[in-house]
Design a protein with these regions (language model features):
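A generic structural motif
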Residues: 130, 173, 185, 242-244
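Pseudouridine synthases involved in rRNA/tRNA modification
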Residues: 23, 42, 161-164, 187, ...
Length: 277
């Protein structure tokens, strides 16, 4: 009625209400500003009209936020401006490498989210841990809870009271005495689950700057294991699931990065390898 009012005003029959125009964020904004990503930086492991599975390198965040302007998904959209729909089906930590699913249709995304909640997506990781892991196969069922450091950094810990249920199956591949090479199968998908579960057994991951042994990792960076190694040794190696749209079985394998293979080769060359039974 040609005047301003507040939220307490009651409307009467015949009142004229004008709402000022609102500025809304446009999805095209990240396409214009995010740098494109070359295929050599992000190898494609599988692609059809519904799914895109890529081999994410260590150091690339899956998405923007927390001090990261653009992550993998924003850069992927910038690289494929004609794609109407690109969304992450799950996430990997910034320092974790390996297979990551991107959905190209909403139908695939919704179904894949359901499948993950139902435990119908099998996920295997390769990791190198500090110390001599002796069990051929070990189930770790320890509830996990998030907390915040005084610096504002978010972390995860085992918390029997307030934690959410979490289950990881570790399988020994090779023992090298001071470090051990393992497979980890995720039965749940909590933040930092493998890293914190491994730590809870007394075996932090090699190169883990959040939960690892800082002095040990510093020595590893300098070549104490035979070659210089300066990243988290955690790689999403294999995904196995039924295609969310076609119903066909899908198995994706992401080869270990060259730097991880080089470290394993150096460890094997020391002649201290003990294969798991």
């Amino acid at each position: 009625n040609k005047g301003r009012t507040d939220e307490k005003a009651r409307l009467a029959l015949g009142d004229i209400v004008r709402v000022p125009p609102l500025k809304t964020a446009q999805r095209t904004g990240d396409v214009k500003t995010a740098p494109v990503i070359r295929e050599a930086e992000l190898p494609v492991l599988f692609e059809d009209e519904h799914l895109l599975v890529v081999n994410k390198p260590s150091g690339l965040a899956a998405h923007g936020g927390s001090g990261v302007a653009f992550g993998l998904i924003e850069r992927l959209r910038a690289s494929r401006p004609a794609a109407p729909f690109l969304e992450l089906a799950h996430r990997l930590d910034r320092d974790t490498s390996g297979a990551l699913i991107v959905c190209k249709t909403r139908k695939a995304l919704v179904r894949l989210h359901e499948m993950q909640r139902e435990g119908k997506v099998e996920k295997h990781y390769r990791l190198l841990v500090q110390g001599d892991w002796v069990n051929d196969r070990q189930h770790v069922k320890a509830p996990l809870a998030r907390y915040v450091l005084p610096s504002g950094e978010r972390r995860v810990k085992v918390d029997e009271v307030e934690g959410l249920s979490a289950h990881t199956i570790f399988t020994l591949i090779e023992r090298f005495g001071d470090v051990s090479f393992l497979d980890a199968e995720l039965k749940t998908g909590r933040t930092h689950q493998i890293r914190v579960h491994a730590l809870s057994t007394g075996h932090p991951l090699v190169g883990d700057d959040k939960y690892g042994d800082y002095a040990f990792n510093d020595d590893v960076k300098k070549g104490s294991l035979g070659v210089r190694f300066a990243r988290l040794f955690l790689h999403a190696m294999r995904l196995q699931f039924i295609h969310p749209v076609t119903g066909s079985p899908v198995t994706i394998t992401a080869p270990l990065p060259a730097e991880c293979e080089a470290l394993l080769a150096a460890l094997r060359a020391r002649g201290r390898v003990k294969d798991a039974k």
